[in-house]
A protein has these predicted regions:
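Periplasmic c-type cytochrome electron-transfer domains
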Residues: 1-336
Length: 336
C-alpha cells in the first residue's frame, strides 16, 4: 500500500495496479437486476407471514458471515431506557402491535404498520411478469431495512441507463436518519418523506411508471401515510457507544491503546474526519472521490466499472453493525 501511495493516479492506471477487489461490485446477475434477499430473511418471512421472497432465477451472492447481525436490535430515540425494543425478534406485520403498543403513539404505530406491509414490486407482484414462482403480495420496506436497520439485501439503482451503468445498491441502515439531510446515495432527495414516497412510486419498479401502473403501484398519501412512515423512521436511534463521549470522541479511560491510535489516524494522517465529522461522522454532503482516476473503464461481470459520480457521506456512527461497505457493497469488511 505504501508503494502504491507513492505513485500518481496516472501511473497506477497505466500499469494496471488498482486492486481488482476494489472495482465496482456487480449485482448477483447484473443483466437482470432486481431485489434479491439473503436466505435467512427469506426463511423468517416465510415462517412468520407465509410470504415467499425467493427468486426462481437467482440467489443472493454474499456469504452470511459478511452480513449484518440478524435480527438486528432496534433502538428508539424516544425510549433509550428500553434498550432493544425488538426483544431479539424480527419485527413483522404479525408481531409489531404486540411489541410496540404502549411504546409508540397511534400515528407512529400506523407508520410502522405501513413500513411492514408488503406492496407490489417489479420482481414480486401478482401479475405474470414477476420473478417469484407464485403470485406475490410484494415487498415491504422492512424486508430490506429489517428492524429498521439493514440485512444487506441488494438491488440496482433505478436512476441510470443503460443497464451496465446502474449501480448495485448497498441497503443502508435507517438508524440515525433523524440527523441526516440527504437521502439516496446519489439522487440527493432532501427529506426521508421524499425518499419514502419515491421508493414505492419509482425505485420499486426500476424507475418505470408505466410498468408500475401495470403491476399495481401503491401510491402513498403524502399528508398522512408518508408522514407517519417518516415519523417512525426518525425514531430509529444509533446503538449505544459507551466508549464515545457526547462530542463523539473516545473516552481515554475506556478506550484501548489500539482504539486511541485509530482515532489519531482518523483525525490525522488518514483525513477521514474531513468528511466524516463527529459526533455522527457525516458532513451531510455529497463528494465525488473520482476513483476512476486509478483504472481504465472496463466491463466486470455485467457492470461497467467507470465514474461513480458524487456519493452521499453516510454516517459512520455504528458502522461496525452494517457490513458490507461503500455504496455498492464492494468492501466486505471495515479493513477493506
Amino acid at each position: 500500500w505504501e508503494e502504491l501511495a507513492r505513485l500518481s493516479p496516472e501511473e497506477i492506471r497505466k500499469q494496471g495496479l488498482f486492486p481488482g477487489g476494489f472495482l465496482p461490485l456487480p449485482h448477483p446477475n447484473h443483466a437482470e437486476g432486481g431485489m434479491v434477499f439473503p436466505k435467512f430473511l427469506i426463511d423468517e418471512i416465510k415462517r412468520q407471514e407465509s410470504r415467499d421472497l425467493t427468486r426462481f432465477d437467482l440467489d443472493y451472492d454474499l456469504p452470511d458471515h459478511f452480513l449484518p447481525e440478524f435480527p438486528a436490535p432496534m433502538f428508539l430515540t424516544t425510549r433509550p431506557d428500553l434498550g432493544d425494543v425488538s426483544k431479539g425478534k424480527l419485527v413483522t406485520i404479525d408481531n409489531y402491535f404486540e411489541l410496540f403498543n404502549g411504546i409508540l403513539n397511534p400515528k407512529q404505530l400506523e407508520g410502522l404498520r405501513l413500513l411492514l406491509t408488503a406492496f407490489p414490486q417489479q420482481q414480486f407482484n401478482l401479475t405474470d411478469d414477476r420473478r417469484s414462482e407464485h403470485p406475490s403480495r410484494g415487498v415491504a420496506c422492512f424486508d430490506c431495512h429489517a428492524n429498521g436497520h439493514t440485512n444487506a439485501a441488494t438491488h440496482l439503482a433505478g436512476d441510470v441507463r443503460p443497464q451496465p451503468f446502474r449501480h448495485r445498491i448497498d441497503t443502508p441502515t435507517l438508524r440515525g436518519v433523524n440527523i441526516q439531510r440527504l437521502f439516496g446515495s446519489q439522487r440527493a432527495l432532501k427529506t426521508v418523506e421524499d425518499f419514502t414516497e419515491f421508493e414505492q412510486r419509482a425505485a420499486y419498479f426500476d424507475g418505470d411508471p408505466v410498468i408500475a401502473t401495470k403491476k399495481g403501484v401503491n401510491v402513498l398519501e403524502r399528508g398522512s401515510q408518508v408522514h407517519f412512515m417518516g415519523e417512525f423512521q426518525a425514531l430509529l436511534d444509533f446503538p449505544p457507544a459507551p466508549k464515545l463521549d457526547v462530542e463523539g470522541r473516545l473516552d481515554p479511560g475506556k478506550a484501548s491503546e489500539q482504539e486511541l491510535r485509530g482515532e489519531k489516524l482518523f483525525y490525522g494522517k488518514a483525513a477521514c474526519a474531513g468528511c466524516h465529522a463527529p459526533p455522527y461522522f457525516t458532513d451531510n454532503l455529497m463528494h465525488n472521490l473520482k476513483v476512476e482516476r486509478f483504472y481504465d473503464p472496463k466491463l466486470v461481470n455485467g457492470v461497467m466499472a467507470s465514474a461513480d459520480g458524487p456519493i452521499k457521506t453516510f454516517p459512520l456512527r455504528g458502522i461496525k453493525d452494517s457490513p458490507p461497505y461503500l455504496h455498492d457493497d464492494r468492501l466486505l469488511t471495515l479493513e477493506d
